[in-house]
Amino acid sequence: MAEVGGLGLRIVGFVLFAVVALATTGEAAGKVPGTLIVRDALTLPNHSVRIEVQVAVKTAGPPLSGVVLHLQIDGKEVATGKTGESGQVSFDYLAKMRGTNVISVLIDQEAPIAAEKVDATLCVWERRRPIVVVEVDALVQQDPASATPAPSPVMGATDDTAPIPVPEAAEELARLTQYYYNVVYVWNYEQGPTRNASSGQVRRWLGAHQFPAGFVATSTSGGLNATLDALKSDGWTTMKSGIGRTRGFADMLLQHRMEVVVVPELPKGELPRKAKSAKDWKEVRKKL
């Protein structure tokens, strides 16, 4: 009888487990798949910074308003907020210490939308430290035998089609930023190896290949010129240098009265008159 009773309990337990599993699966299946979008944030020590998050969905579903999001800094939850009708929510965070922090945003488990956690970088910088602007194209290895541009980092660092970093670029850039420079990363959204890449995809590619943490500037309709103007208007006037690959990048930085190093060397006659060139990344530090 004891064996029969034990068997009966196990059967009941299995049935209950199956019911719970089906209910959970049904609940998850009823959610609309979505995406969380968060940009890097830049501020001063002991200053408040606004972190803006967007909830996006590809198909029609539940209203985007009222979705609860959780904000974490370096893995510690610091705030929760609800989205408005546009699916946006803003968090104000007081950054105390100089350095870089990991911003993480998670969607609440009870939300009608399912989305993976997303990360960004919070840069807490002092204004006196110089900033180097780096064109992401200069970090991506080009295939000289191919007539087509290299694929963008959209596929992720573990995919065979993902861009390969230039040898020694991460190491040399880390040396530049260890004690002296802060780094702002920019890229061309419309063409080149980083075309159609989002800031999150660029950020993940940089992290996967051990490039130093920095501010990944979001592409705007005004291009690089608008990005530089926005940083200056926010008080970041110590942008003195840049490292890039293309003539367009070099021309724009020279217009902003910045020194610029192009790596590798451009074909003869294409280098702007006041720009410097380096054969490889080992030469870059000597040129700045």
Language-model segments: which ranges?
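Beta-strand-rich domain onsets/edges
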Residues: 29-50, 122-126
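Beta-strand-rich structural segments
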Residues: 44-63, 69, 140
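Short amphipathic beta-strand segments in non-cytosolic proteins
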Residues: 68-79
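Short, aromatic- and glycine-rich surface loops/edge beta-strands on solvent-exposed regions
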Residues: 98-111
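Conserved, compact domain cores that house catalytic/ligand-binding motifs in diverse enzymes
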Residues: 126-219
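C-terminal cap/substrate-recognition subdomain and adjoining C-terminal extension
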Residues: 193-288
